[in-house]
């Protein structure tokens, strides 16, 4: 079906509409063989609060952006190659329901659908696209993924020393390896994580010690379904600001 749609006028028109919604700041999306599989609004768990984001699933990439005017204008376009994507379901917990993790070597995050059916459809379509891509390319799924950042609202004290309380002066930072919220003194070191940046990035002392000894796996994040506190803040429907988890800290 995907091959049949690839060169259809309807598919070309749909992709052109998506391009126009992102405007000149967005990347061109029309290439031979690319098919728009589906689209919809998902709640993305950002650093400070959950936010509505518009997602577009193509047969080779996943695109999302901030909603300025629904179905008319989006900005802050992000493009994720599907061949690098792994997804994992998240258990329902309180108000956080119908979620899954989108994991890549450069960035990982949680998203939530409005219904269980919508979640199932998204996950099934993403998995099929990834499987088809890997089958055609002969590549193997990536086993290295960036940490999913723990939302700021889940940590009132440093998650490493368990002592430092966060205040407007004592700021929160995120370890790029484990995703924990940590204080400045517990994250003064930097380490080169090539999949995330060409420059050394901030990591916590715990991960630094493990990485320095070559124990890369020991500091892999384990908190895949613990985001319950983040929905205590209301959903920000006006999503014309940057993703909070794109900040430097």
UniProtKB/Swiss-Prot annotation:
Start and end residues, zinc fingers (FYVE-type): 152-212
Binding residues annotated for Zn(2+) 1, in chain numbering: 158, 161, 183, 186
Cell compartments where the protein resides: Early endosome membrane; Endoplasmic reticulum
Biased composition (Acidic residues): 238-249
UniProt region (Disordered), positions on chain: 221-249
Pfam families reported in the protein's UniProt record: FYVE, PH
Induction conditions: Up-regulated by TNF, bacterial lipopolysaccharides (LPS) and phorbol myristate acetate (PMA) (at protein level).
Task performed by this protein: May play a role in early endosome fusion upstream of RAB5, hence regulating receptor trafficking and fluid-phase transport. Enhances cellular sensitivity to TNF-induced apoptosis.
Description of its domains: The PH and FYVE domains may be important for TNF-induced localization to the endoplasmic reticulum and for enhanced cellular sensitivity to TNF-induced apoptosis. The FYVE domain is important for binding to the endosomal membrane.
Designated name of the protein: Pleckstrin homology domain-containing family F member 2
Origin species: Mus musculus (Mouse)
């Amino acid at each position: 079906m995907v091959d049949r749609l690839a060169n259809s006028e309807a598919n070309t028109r749909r992709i052109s509409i998506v391009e126009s919604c992102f405007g000149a700041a967005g990347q061109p999306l029309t290439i031979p063989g690319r098919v728009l599989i589906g689209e919809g609004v998902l709640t993305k768990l950002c650093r400070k609060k959950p936010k509505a984001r518009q997602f577009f699933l193509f047969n080779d990439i996943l695109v999302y952006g901030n909603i300025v005017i629904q179905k008319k204008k989006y900005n802050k376009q992000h493009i994720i190659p599907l061949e690098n994507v792994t997804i994992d379901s998240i258990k329902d917990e309180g108000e956080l329901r119908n979620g899954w993790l989108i994991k890549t070597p450069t960035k990982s995050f949680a998203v939530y659908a409005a219904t269980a059916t919508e979640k199932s459809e998204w996950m099934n379509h993403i998995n099929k696209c990834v499987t088809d891509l890997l089958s055609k390319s002969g590549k193997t799924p990536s086993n290295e993924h960036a940490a999913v950042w723990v939302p700021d609202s889940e940590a009132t004290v440093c998650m490493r020393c368990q002592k430092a309380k966060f205040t407007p002066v004592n700021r929160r930072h995120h370890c790029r390896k484990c995703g924990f919220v940590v204080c400045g003194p517990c994250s003064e070191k930097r380490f080169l994580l090539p999949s995330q940046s060409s420059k050394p990035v901030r990591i916590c002392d715990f991960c630094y010690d493990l990485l320095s000894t070559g124990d890369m796996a020991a500091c892999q994040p384990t908190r895949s379904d613990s985001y319950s506190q983040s929905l205590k803040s209301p959903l920000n429907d006006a999503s014309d600001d940057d993703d909070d988890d794109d900040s430097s800290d």
